[in-house]
Amino acid sequence: MNMKLTVPFYLHKASAGFPSPATDYIEEDIDLNVHLIKNVPATFIIRVQGKSMNDIGIHDGDLLVVDKSLNPKNFSTVIANVHDELVVKSFVQEKDKKFLTSGSKKFEDRILINEEEDIFIWGVVTYVIHSVY
């Protein structure tokens, strides 16, 4: 993870409304590691398989940047270990109980986080990378 990965970065913003007469040149290069990875030793990338998180913008084949050093907040997207299988879920806390839920109405699961049953948070998703082409 020590390799520097740079890509061209345009300082001009892309308008989501009416077009702006922006210039067509690159201002600088950016290192994606600097922008996507805050804690290198605790960060990994995992590919999504399945459709249970579609409603929150995470799709089959997406890449997730995950930081194992972060503590999840209510409704954070997390990678969890559920009986030795890694899954992507939403973290939900209600009073003194913590649950994992799917981000799709088609999948109505609700898993109680219980380390005694080998269910625990592996890391917090910080970025989602998916193809739009």
Language-model features: where?
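C-terminal structural segments of small proteins and small subunits
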Residues: 107-114, 120-128
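Short coil-to-beta-strand transition motifs
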Residues: 60, 82-86, 119-120
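Hydrophobic beta-strand signal
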Residues: 65-66, 79
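Structural motif
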Residues: 61-62, 76
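Short, positionally conserved secondary-structure boundary motifs
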Residues: 1-54, 85-86, 93, 97-98, ...
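Short, hydrophobic/aromatic-rich segments at coil-to-beta transitions
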Residues: 43, 73-78
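PDZ-domain C-terminal substructure recognizer with occasional recognition of PDZ-binding tails
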Residues: 82, 87-107, 111
